[in-house]
Amino acid sequence: MECDKCGRDAVMHAAYSGAHLCDDHFCASVEKRVRRRIREDNMLPRDASPENPQTWVIGLSGGKDSVVLTHILDDTFGRDPRIELVALTIHEGIEGYRDKSVDACVELAEDLDIHHELVTYEDEFGVQMDDVVEKDPENMAACAYCGVFRRDLLERFADELGADKLLTGHNLDDEAQTALMNFFEGDLKQVAKHFDASIGDFEKRRDAGEFIPRAKPLRDVPEKEVALYAHLKDLPAHITECPHSSEAYRGEIQQLLLKLEENHPGTRHSIMAGYEELAELTAREYRGEGRVDLNDCERCGSKTAGDVCRKCRLIESIEAV
């Protein structure tokens, strides 16, 4: 199998496009898609300058997606005076798993010479995920606890780091799964929120207010291609599933999508093309509907619809066991 562009041995065949690419042309293709997404989403404001630079905080977990995203962003903007890249890693406290991925984060940040911040659940909340899973006071999946804690720390420390944007390594598979889940739940208001929260053109989004705007530059690249890119570039990615992973519904959607993609190549791209258009339309229709005024949490000061935020209620519940 030869590369369509140069005749060298191909390392991959993209069934959705018919392309056969060698290692160099494949990696260039991934990088091109990430850079195109950055342009199409207008991530870099027109007024960004060396005197008024943007700070982009990257959620760096050490997994393949965030490692590849950080590598490509550094390759693209590492010497651009209009942008400062900062890597933010959250250590949840999962024995035998997170320490290895943190090592990957530290190695990558040192290799790229970018500012790297490490934050732990234990330091910030006085808990570790292993203990939370064992106690499970709310009888919830581990991911339900972890999602609340991670979002809080990413938002809080991105703000402390002066972030203009918070970037995460969600790939095409991740986003197509989320799109299908929103379709199946029939929640158009959630689709509208998705546009303003992370997938919309920045010039068309509603202002994020006190929250850090989010972006997903890797969302046009399939998961397997992200993994292949990490391998070919010999990046220090920790490719192991979290031992507490428990999103059963998303797992079903993942298997459904993989089967559809196998039988009908291009399904994920088609889903996202339609979903992004629908998200923009629903954002115009539902934007602001049901919006509630946010208060400062009585305990930690974070924004919440009630008096005490979800994170603080969970911590109280865990400590009571």
From Swiss-Prot:
Keywords: Isopeptide bond, Transferase, tRNA processing, Ubl conjugation. GO terms for cellular component: cytosolic tRNA wobble base thiouridylase complex. GO terms for biological process: response to heat; tRNA wobble base 5-methoxycarbonylmethyl-2-thiouridinylation; tRNA wobble position uridine thiolation. One of its GO terms (molecular function) is enzyme binding. Pathway: tRNA modification; 5-methoxycarbonylmethyl-2-thiouridine-tRNA biosynthesis. InterPro entries: CTU1-like_ATP-bd, Ncs6/Tuc1/Ctu1, Rossmann-like_a/b/a_fold, TilS/TtcA_N, tRNA_thiolation_TtcA_Ctu1, TtuA-like_LIM_N. There is a cross-link at residue 204 (Glycyl lysine isopeptide (Lys-Gly) (interchain with G-Cter in SAMP2)). Sampylated at Lys-204 with the archaeal ubiquitin-like protein SAMP2. Polymeric chains of SAMP2 are also linked. Its EC number is 2.7.7.-. Disruption phenotype: Cells lacking this gene are nonthiolated at the wobble uridine position of tRNA(Lys). No effect on cell growth or yield at 42 degrees Celsius. Transferring the cells grown at 42 degrees Celsius to 50 degrees Celsius results in a slow-growth phenotype. It is an enzyme of class 2 (transferase). Belongs to the TtcA family. CTU1/NCS6/ATPBD3 subfamily. Interacts with monomeric and polymeric forms of SAMP2. Interacts with UbaA. Interacts with archaeal EF-1-alpha and Pan1. Non-sampylated protein forms a complex with archaeal CPSF1 of approximately 100 kDa. Required for thiolation of mcm(5)S(2)U at the wobble uridine position of tRNA specific for lysine (tRNA(Lys)). Probably acts by catalyzing adenylation of tRNA, an intermediate required for 2-thiolation. May also act as a sulfurtransferase that transfers sulfur from thiocarboxylated SAMP2 onto the uridine of tRNA at wobble position. Required for cell growth at elevated temperatures. This is tRNA 2-thiolation protein NcsA. It comes from Haloferax volcanii (strain ATCC 29605 / DSM 3757 / JCM 8879 / NBRC 14742 / NCIMB 2012 / VKM B-1768 / DS2).
